[in-house]
Amino acid sequence: MEQTLSIIKPDAVAKNVVGKIIDRFESNGLKVAAAKRLQLSRADAEQFYAVHKERPFFKDLVDFMVSGPVVAMVLEGENAVLKNRDLMGATDPKKAAPGTIRADFADSIDANAVHGSDSLENAKIEIAFFFSGREIN
C-alpha cells in the first residue's frame, strides 16, 4: 500500500480545521497511518525544505512553518501520493479547484493549509524525516 506525507500547516491548525482536513483524506480512501502535532524548529524547517534553499520564497516559507504548530501525518492508500495532491489542489488557493482542501481552507499561496509529498521517492524521505518505522501502523 502506498504511503505519503501530509503536513497540515500553521494557518490551518490555527483555524481549527484539522479535523475537517483529516475527514477529507479519510472519506476519499486515505487512512491516517501515523500522526503527530509538533512545533517545528527553524533548523527542522530549513532542513525539511532544503530543496528550496536557493529559491526567493525560502525564508518566508521557513518563517511561516515555524510560526505555529503543524500536524504531520502518514497517509496510506492506493495511489496515495497522487490522491493526496488531487485533494490538496493547486499550490495557489486562488487557482485551486472548488472542493479541494486549499480552495476551502487556504488564504494565500504562502498560507496554503497543507503540504503533500510530490513523488513516491520524496514521500519515503519526508516520512522518515518525521516518523520512525515503529510509529507507523
Swiss-Prot record:
A Pfam family hit: NDK
Cofactors that this protein relies on: Mg(2+)
Keyword Kinase assigned: yes
Coiled coil (UniProt feature): none
InterPro entries tied to this protein: NDK-like_dom (IPR034907), NDK-like_dom_sf (IPR036850), Nucleoside_diP_kinase (IPR001564), Nucleoside_diP_kinase_AS (IPR023005)
Keyword Cytoplasm part of the UniProt annotation: yes
First-level EC class: transferase
Keywords on record: ATP-binding, Cytoplasm, Kinase, Magnesium, Metal-binding, Nucleotide metabolism, Nucleotide-binding, Phosphoprotein, Transferase
GO MF term set: ATP binding; metal ion binding; nucleoside diphosphate kinase activity
Localization: Cytoplasm
Biological-process GO terms, alphabetical: CTP biosynthetic process; GTP biosynthetic process; UTP biosynthetic process
Main location: cytoplasm
Active site positions: 115
NCBIfam families: PRK00668.1
Similarity comment: family membership: Belongs to the NDK family.
Function: Major role in the synthesis of nucleoside triphosphates other than ATP. The ATP gamma phosphate is transferred to the NDP beta phosphate via a ping-pong mechanism, using a phosphorylated active-site intermediate.
Self-association and partners: Homotetramer.
Protein name: Nucleoside diphosphate kinase
